[in-house]
Regions:
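ABC-family P-loop ATPase nucleotide-binding domain
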Residues: 1-43, 47-87, 293-308
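ABC family nucleotide-binding domain
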Residues: 77-286, 291
């Protein structure tokens, strides 16, 4: 990597987290803080993220029209959230973003959180990702209570265990695709090579291109590569296709699909686009801060077969 200077605001985007969140991946938190296992060393039950797809947690097979057998369960419980309430105070007005949400997510699962704007999707995802804490209730990541975590614990948790993908890419304009990913891999304990991560999302031939030389879909795939290069336990995606046209959005969904399938990365995607729900193992519908319904897809649609 060439010697490049970046500002503090740019550095805070290196892990896909907006500078508005006040999260910096270069804040000096020790990899052994708060009792979490070392990043990338192993996942629970001794299964590495790279081996997860071979562990029996995922059961898949090729069906006609490119569909795949849905996740069959059996993975460890990665997230348990109970009774989540989130209040925001806007002047004298109290806004309830979540109203008693229960949510479980198991290792290797692909879940779509579906609902209109204001339904609580992003608030729930932010709490799962350690970007926010609930006003009431609790959320556990494995054996760790994130709802009681201090800033050091949550910063370490985000940096070593969670990959974020947002609607906006947050790439550093002065760095190439490879260098944007390497900002994260330089901080992780057992990362992929940047080239490997970019190859996974179909950008092996675009390593040395700058964001301005990439299309919107390609920039989003760089953001996905950056998110998964540190081998996170979970990939959290907030409207990853929201700024893209249908054709480009499908390519981005194929990248997310491949990461879940080949790496066994637990994946949660929030969207207002009901068509995307067809590619999930499980679909959770939110409305007015509550879980309105939950269903499973017996057979998952391939991303390339989705139309909207």
């Amino acid at each position: 990597m060439r010697n490049v200077r970046v500002t503090a605001a740019e550095a805070s985007r290196a892990d896909g987290v907006s500078p508005m969140d006040g999260v910096s991946p270069v804040d000096g938190v020790s990899p052994a803080v708060a009792g979490f296992p070392a990043a990338g060393a192993s996942s629970a039950a001794g299964v590495s993220p790279a081996d997860a797809s071979q562990s029996g947690t995922l059961q898949s097979g090729t069906l006609q029209s490119g569909t795949r057998v849905a996740w069959a369960g059996g993975g460890e419980l990665m997230f348990e959230a109970r009774g989540l309430v989130k209040r925001y105070q806007l002047g004298e007005v109290e806004v309830l973003a979540l109203r008693g949400v229960d949510f479980l997510l198991r290792s290797g699962e692909f879940v779509v959180l579906l609902g209109p704007s204001g339904s609580g999707k992003s608030t729930l995802l932010n709490i799962l990702g350690g970007l926010d804490t609930p006003s009431e209730g609790f959320v556990r990541f494995r054996d760790h209570d994130l709802s009681q975590g201090d800033d050091d614990l949550l910063t370490h948790y985000r940096r070593d265990h969670v990959g974020f993908v947002f609607q906006f890419y947050n790439l550093i304009p002065s760095l190439t695709a490879r260098e944007n990913v390497q900002l994260v891999t330089d901080l992780a304990a057992a990362p992929m090579r940047p080239e490997e991560a970019l190859e996974l999302v179909g950008l092996g031939a675009r390593l040395d291109h700058y964001p301005s030389q990439l299309s919107g879909g390609e920039q989003q795939r760089v953001a996905i590569a950056r998110a998964i290069a540190k081998r996170p336990d979970v990939l959290l995606c907030d409207e990853p296709t929201g700024a893209l046209d249908v054709r480009t959005g499908i390519v981005v969904l194929e990248a997310i699909e491949r990461i879940n399938r080949e790496l066994g990365t637990t994946t949660a995607v929030i969207t207002h686009n009901a068509a995307i729900a067809a590619m999930a193992d499980r679909v959770v519908q939110l409305s007015d801060g509550r879980v309105a319904s939950e269903s499973r897809n017996a057979v998952k649609a391939a991303a390339r077969d989705i139309q909207w």
